[in-house]
Amino acid sequence: MEVPISGGGGGERFCHAAQVVGADGEMDGEAMARFAAGAGLLGRGLSYAVVSIVGPQGSGKSTLLNQLFGTSFTEMDALKGRSQTTKGIWIAKAVGIEPFTVVMDLEGTDGRERGEDDTAFEKQSALFALAVSDIVMINLWCHDIGREHAANRPLLKTIFEVLMRLFSPRKTTLLLVIRDKTKTPLEYLTQALKEDIQKIWNAVRKPEVYKEAALSEFFNVEVTALSSYEEKENLFKEQVGQLRQRFIHSIAPGGLAADRRGVIPASGFCLSALQIWKVIRENKDLNLPAHKIMVATVRCEEIADEKLRSFISDKGWLELETAANSGLVPGFGKKLNAILDFYLSEYDTEAMYFDEDVRTAKRQQLESEILKHTYDAFKKMLEHLHHVVLNKFKSDLEQSLRSGEGFAASARYCVQSSMAEFDAGLRDALVKHAEWDTTKVRSKLEQHIEAHATSVRGTKLAELKANYEKKLLDTLAGPVQSILETGEKDSWACIRRLYRHATESAILAFSASLSEFELDQTTIRKMVMELREHARSIVEEKAREEAGNVLMRMKERFSTVLSRDKDSMPRTWKGNEDIRAITREARLAALRLMSVMAAVRLDDKPDKIDRALTTALLDGGPLSQKRSIEFTSDPLASSTWEEVSEKNTLITPVQCKSIWRQFNAETEYAVAQAISMQEAHRRSNNWLPPAWTVLLLAILGYNEFIFLLRNPLYLLGLFVAFVVSYAAWLQYDITAYFRHGTLSGLLTITSGFLPTIMDIITAVINMSHNQKSSSHPPRHRPPLHPQSFRNQAQQQSQAQVQYQAPSSLSSSSSVGSNSDDES
């Protein structure tokens, strides 16, 4: 509570005074906290002192404190009788004294209110005063000095007894204040007091550890005297003023409270007082060093918790955390370090006076808790950094490859630059107080980069391989097909040369391209082998494709050889060709084609396929006589070829036999047609009557022949008719009409004779009309030459004959066919 006191000049000032321990012995922690906060004690650190006063009831303790420190403790009113005024323990702040001085007024001893036997509270309050105070003032009456049973002796005995329950590392100043001083010199009074105190110290039972200990090891004993306040008020106040000066700078070296060992920082004073009183009330020994550690522990924890809460709610940290969750934050570590250092420095400032070991331990815990709270944001930063660096690696690698750099060099450079960028970003994001393990994150990034590089390398190798495979396909497929279609004996020799040249060229270029990837030799050999096998598969696939069309190719080859001569000119069947020999030659060419396509011969191993096919299928061949010697049975009655592996077999012997049978069946018509055309040509060339017919005509027409010789005019007419007929013969190519037989030729000529006569008549009429018109010409025209008429008529006749020739030819052909059937 706050108690107003009167000050000089008639003004009124306030001093913070509070009852912290009631008459019932219970401490009011809230009152203690209110006092500390209101008086400004919490921020004083170690720069404060605690003064308490003990003494008999009614000895003027409260009056002395009020006069000495300007406090407002309740004083006894002498007019109302000598009764107890101070109950329990009161606390206040000294006014106008530096350092900050806490003043405690304790309940007087030897009071009638508690009774003669109730000394428990006296001992407890005395022990509390010794535990928390730097200076303990003992109020004594001057007339009691030297008496054996004076009131001060039980009090001193109580103080020395409770001292044994303390384990304090520092000395406490005992300031003996002699009240109502007489004329006896102070030196004699001091000597008498010290002798009495020494006797009391010697009489007190002490533990073995302190049995030989001197009083000076525990106390600094000081003695002062004051005149009577009631009789010599002015002198009393003057002496109090002099005593007050001794409390100014009391904690400085040489001051009243110079021993500062084990002092509790001001922020922990309330907690310390509460805990000390609790231990005292429980009648336990009070270990002040351990109590100091306890107070430091509790108080440092409170400070650390407060700073942690402040950090968690800090606006700068919240903004930084939000930014880190959404993306990469430049200077993340620097910004977080600044915030962290701020709160750690605040902790250091507030906890600097507590035990160093406790302070350091709690600081580490605070730092650990803050870092634990920030770790998620740091992880997010690493995730963003991982994502950014990985994407940049992908982009840089792709751009480098597009610029034409080799894969291995590009990947190596991009990996180095990306990891350097990651390390720089990691340093930028690290918190200097943290010892977070980032090796796993870095290793994970390296794995992802390596995986992407491996994927890109695989893709590029696949593209490179596909490119060379396509080149091999373009180089081999067409030429191999063309060579196989020729069906020559050296076809596979040509294919082998082509295959080796194309394969070696491709492998040479492919190996040079693979050097950019810096692959191991095992991988290179494997890929080269795969490319070589692909080239072989192209040839084999094309050979199998052509083998599937072997029957069609054989028929084409047969037709080509049969229908064209050695100069590749269309063959005309004039009647003198050897169709049997030509047919054999065509079948031999077709058989050779099937032999070429029967097996893959890339290994240049000899086989007997051609000989077996010729011997077994081509009857009458030059090797047929050796069949019984070389082949004891049918060589085609098998599913495999001799000296040819199954994988290289394209057409089995049984399949060859079946194909040949089908081939013969499908080519018989072409041979029969050739024979028919040859026979037709022969008949067309024999349009003149037979010789016996000519002889018969000569015998039977002898008289008519003699008649013509005797009449030259008839002979001349016959001659003219012959000339005209011959001219017409040549003009209209009458021979062509008789190629398909005499009857068909006559029918064709007869069908075209009437239109020709009509054309001639029309031409004559037109010429006559033109001559009449020319007798009255409007302008001169060139004369019509007779030859032009003939030319015009001839051209029209020829056009008419040519127009009618196809139908006539078809008619003659049909007639000739019918006549042949009838004959």
UniProtKB/Swiss-Prot annotation:
Subcellular location: Endoplasmic reticulum membrane
Topology versus the membrane: Multi-pass membrane protein
Molecular function terms from GO: GTP binding; GTPase activity
Domain GB1/RHD3-type G: start-end pairs: 45-260
GO process terms (BP): endoplasmic reticulum membrane fusion
Intervals, Lumenal compartment: 710-712
Region annotated Disordered, chain positions: 770-823
Residue numbers binding GTP: G55, P56, Q57, G58, S59, G60, K61, S62
Low complexity bias (residue ranges): 786-823
Coiled coil: 226-246
Regions crossing the membrane: 689-709, 713-733
Disulfide bridges in this chain: none
EC number: 3.6.5.-
Entry keywords, A to Z: Coiled coil, Endoplasmic reticulum, GTP-binding, Hydrolase, Membrane, Nucleotide-binding, Transmembrane, Transmembrane helix
UniProt keyword Secreted present: no
Gene Ontology cellular component list: endoplasmic reticulum; endoplasmic reticulum membrane
Listed Pfam families: RHD3_GTPase, Sey1_3HB
Cytoplasmic compartment spans: 1-688, 734-823
PANTHER family (UniProt xref): PROTEIN ROOT HAIR DEFECTIVE 3 HOMOLOG 2 (PTHR45923:SF7), PROTEIN SEY1 (PTHR45923)
Family: Belongs to the TRAFAC class dynamin-like GTPase superfamily. GB1/RHD3 GTPase family. RHD3 subfamily.
Job of this protein: Probable GTP-binding protein that may be involved in cell development.
Name recorded for this polypeptide: Protein ROOT HAIR DEFECTIVE 3 homolog 2
Species of the source: Oryza sativa subsp. japonica
Lineage per the UniProt record: Eukaryota, Viridiplantae, Streptophyta, Embryophyta, Tracheophyta
